């Protein structure tokens, strides 16, 4: 199969933003990696946060992708050229600037790449939010330490609060928690109540209501012990801690937490950083840095095997999509829309076919 020597990609510029590079270098897959021709991408908050927090001119942005395998690393045994796949990588990575997904081609670790079933299109696969699936797996098992598996549900259900559940991360968390045999409850804006219930929430609360925390506490009988918080700002931490039961519990956040989050000793805080699931060291800062972690990598490989089986069984329903036209120009527009908080209850997807 012909592979060009260069590709079009969206890279960081030297002014703290993004630009389209029509002559970006073609990445070479390492022994355990795949080279994928990208057919669709999804846009995540991390796609603007990475270049804002960790400026690296020339680094390719983007984390989620779906496409076709065009080249195999020397150690890859479980994929073939032509396989339809999806996955997530560390975009705008200072340690590997060529690795983002907003490009005609990207590289992906074979252990963290999912094969698409025939009935799932590239666009629909992006509704799964593969970056979010990585993060939620870490939050559920390493942060909340919930028993059970989506393939072998727990015998005794726990109630789990998913704060801000109308995002793709939220709807995937709701489904996975249900599959594990637990009871998800949720917060979101009232306009998304029905959406969140369709994805498995037992009860939903308005996170803009000043009494939201107390309402959750009353609903759970002051016994709530498990919370996932994608926002992790001062307001969300305060709400989640108000909702937490008298005895405390486990709080898994998806952003770096403010210092006061550690003041309530009965609450165990865990920062679930999805890009750390691969077990590689992260040359970042501000609490996002990580040492190499073979145990986390082993866990991540096992989690992706579970996700692959769930895909084959058709047990994960993609988040509602909003497709943007314009290819790479559409991606730039979408990143700005997410940055400006113009998206609610939908996953922005751009086709590159």
Curated annotation (Swiss-Prot):
Annotated disulfide bonds: none
Binding site for substrate: 131-138, 274-278
Leading EC class: oxidoreductase
Gene3D superfamilies: Medium-chain alcohol dehydrogenases, catalytic domain, NAD(P)-binding Rossmann-like Domain
Binding site for NADP(+): 46-49, 189-192, 207, 254-255, 343-344
Domain of life: Eukaryota
Enzyme Commission code(s) on record: 1.-.-.-
Name of the protein this chain belongs to: Trans-enoyl reductase RAP2
Up-regulation conditions: Expressed exclusively during fungal penetration of host leaves, the time point at which plant defense reactions are triggered.
Keyword NADP among record annotations: yes
Single GO MF descriptor: nucleotide binding
Signal peptide: none
Family: Belongs to the zinc-containing alcohol dehydrogenase family.
Function: Trans-enoyl reductase; part of the gene cluster that mediates the biosynthesis of a tyrosine-derived cytochalasan acting as a fungal signal recognized by resistant rice plants and leads to avirulence in Pi33 resistant rice cultivars. The first step in the pathway is catalyzed by the hybrid PKS-NRPS ACE1, assisted by the enoyl reductase RAP1, that are responsible for fusion of the tyrosine precursor and the polyketide backbone.
UniProt cross-references to Pfam families, sorted A to Z: ADH_N, ADH_zinc_N
Self-association state and partner proteins as the record states: Monomer.
Lineage: Eukaryota, Fungi, Dikarya, Ascomycota, Pezizomycotina
